[in-house]
Amino acid sequence: MPGATGAGVSFGVNAAKALEDGKIDGFWANGMGAEVAVRRGIGTMVLDARRGDGPKAAFGYTFPALATTTALIERSPEQAAAAVRALVKTQGALKANVNLATDVGRKWFPEFEASLIADVVARDLPFYDPGISRETFDLMNRFALAMGLAKQSARYEEVVAVQFRDLWKQR
């Protein structure tokens, strides 16, 4: 979708705008994109995979992830570990005080979207998990193959930085 890439661009917010402008008929995006479309009255939620809509396997098609390169992990493992610790700490802080999301949202989103972020985060908090299980990975891997996004299966250990597994549990 034009305009949906680049630093600081929210795919979901951009998708909701494209829907509002009549450039697209629908989208599959994050909670913020769906929330914007529903609250503005320009869209409806058809499926919410995290809440059991659609095939059971669809639950594994959508989750937040922190991505980096193998090169960075090999070159600066402590930097990668620090990023994981920051993610775990942030998820814990949001679980303790979801309104922190609004404070941060004001720095990244337009005013309307920033006003929604605490509601979106609160709804998704039960699904916040800093780790990616083998089962979730397998579901995503099958989805990527079925959609033609990957040509061959990947191995869990090739994609998920399991060397940081112990950090996932620290809260």
Q: What are these model-predicted stretches?
A:
Residues 36-37, 54-56, 123-125, 160-164:
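Short secondary-structure boundary/hinge segments and terminal tails
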Residues 7, 25-26, 132, 139:
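Residues that cap or flank secondary-structure elements
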Residues 1-10, 14-25, 114-116, 150-156:
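A local structural motif
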Residues 30, 48-49, 117-118, 155-156:
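Short loop/turn and capping residues at structural boundaries
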Residues 142-171:
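Conserved C-terminal helix/tail region of periplasmic/extracytoplasmic solute-binding proteins
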Residues 74-151:
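Secondary-structure end/capping motifs
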Residues 14-107:
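Pocket-lining segment of extracytoplasmic ligand-binding domains
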